[in-house]
Curated annotation (Swiss-Prot):
<dbReference type="InterPro" id="IPR000119">
    <property type="entry name" value="Hist_DNA-bd"/>
</dbReference>
<keyword id="KW-0238">DNA-binding</keyword>
<dbReference type="GO" id="GO:0005829">
    <property type="term" value="C:cytosol"/>
</dbReference>
<dbReference type="GO" id="GO:0006417">
    <property type="term" value="P:regulation of translation"/>
</dbReference>
<dbReference type="InterPro" id="IPR020816">
    <property type="entry name" value="Histone-like_DNA-bd_CS"/>
</dbReference>
<comment type="function">
    <text>This protein is one of the two subunits of integration host factor, a specific DNA-binding protein that functions in genetic recombination as well as in transcriptional and translational control.</text>
</comment>
<dbReference type="GO" id="GO:0006310">
    <property type="term" value="P:DNA recombination"/>
</dbReference>
<keyword id="KW-0810">Translation regulation</keyword>
<dbReference type="Pfam" id="PF00216">
    <property type="entry name" value="Bac_DNA_binding"/>
</dbReference>
<dbReference type="GO" id="GO:0003677">
    <property type="term" value="F:DNA binding"/>
</dbReference>
<protein>
    <recommendedName>
        <fullName>Integration host factor subunit beta</fullName>
    </recommendedName>
</protein>
<comment type="similarity">
    <text>Belongs to the bacterial histone-like protein family.</text>
</comment>
<dbReference type="InterPro" id="IPR010992">
    <property type="entry name" value="IHF-like_DNA-bd_dom_sf"/>
</dbReference>
<dbReference type="GO" id="GO:0030527">
    <property type="term" value="F:structural constituent of chromatin"/>
</dbReference>
<comment type="subunit">
    <text>Heterodimer of an alpha and a beta chain.</text>
</comment>
<dbReference type="GO" id="GO:0005694">
    <property type="term" value="C:chromosome"/>
</dbReference>
<dbReference type="GO" id="GO:0006355">
    <property type="term" value="P:regulation of DNA-templated transcription"/>
</dbReference>
Length: 94
């Protein structure tokens, strides 16, 4: 599901709310989540999961085109850990 599909579905389920208001709310929520993660804070949504940053240590990689060795710096990457309810619901289809 894409962001625009999410907005369409939410707007369809809540016909009394204008689609533009739903779009603005979704964009604002995602922006706030990104800002929170960028500041190093953890986000926990009970029943859904948690978002945090994990550190990737520096390593030696390879340029896939040339095969040359490339030094990659350490960096923080977003990480999502699903909650129990989400895992249980996903296993219904698995």
């Amino acid at each position: 599901m894409t962001k625009s599909e999410l907005i369409e579905r939410l707007a369809g389920q809540h016909a009394h709310i204008q689609a533009k208001v739903v779009e603005d709310a979704v964009k604002e929520m995602l922006e706030h989540m990104a800002t929170t993660l960028a500041s190093g804070e953890r986000i926990e949504i009970r029943g859904f999961g948690s978002f945090s940053l994990h550190y990737r240590a520096p390593r030696i990689g390879r340029n896939p085109k040339t095969g040359d060795r490339v030094e990659l710096e350490g960096k923080y990457v977003p990480h999502f850990k699903p909650g129990k309810e989400l895992r249980d619901r996903a296993n219904i289809y698995g």
